Amino acid sequence: MSQLVETAADTQITQPEQLVVIVTSASLQTQGMAMVLSRAMQEQGVQLTMLLCDQAAELAIQSYQSPRALAPKGMKPEGLLQQIIDAGATVAVCALYLPNSSYQEQDLRQGVSLAQPAKMAEMLRCANSKVLTF
């Protein structure tokens, strides 16, 4: 006999899990771990949105270079961020970042946009979203 009623568990399986990662830390290791975990979850099928704020928003600047690579794989957070972007994540800088920095929108890495507060608020409220902050 076929099942006629879809359960909540069935619905969760068919909908991609939404993850909103907010990175604000200036710490190289914290930025690196945020990128490593975000990329790992993205590889597991999570639909990823990343918001870069405060000093972490520097990662979104095309010319930015971290002071050093992180062991054990010799990666820099901005390199991992580029992998995340290339894999289809939505990445944005905080709406307050550019107006309060010396950068313009054209300085952003390709694939990074300026966050729209109303849209971000909607994503944060979504019952299907998990929010992580670093």
Where in the sequence are the language-model features?
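Positively charged, low-complexity intrinsically disordered leader regions
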Residues: 2-11
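Short, glycine-rich nucleotide/cofactor-binding loops
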Residues: 14, 19-32
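Solvent-exposed loop/turn segments at secondary-structure junctions
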Residues: 26-28, 55-58, 97-101
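Short internal beta-strands
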Residues: 48-54, 91-95
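A glycine-rich helix N-cap at a beta->alpha junction
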Residues: 68-93
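A short aromatic-anchored loop/beta-hairpin motif
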Residues: 84-87, 92, 99-109, 113-122, ...
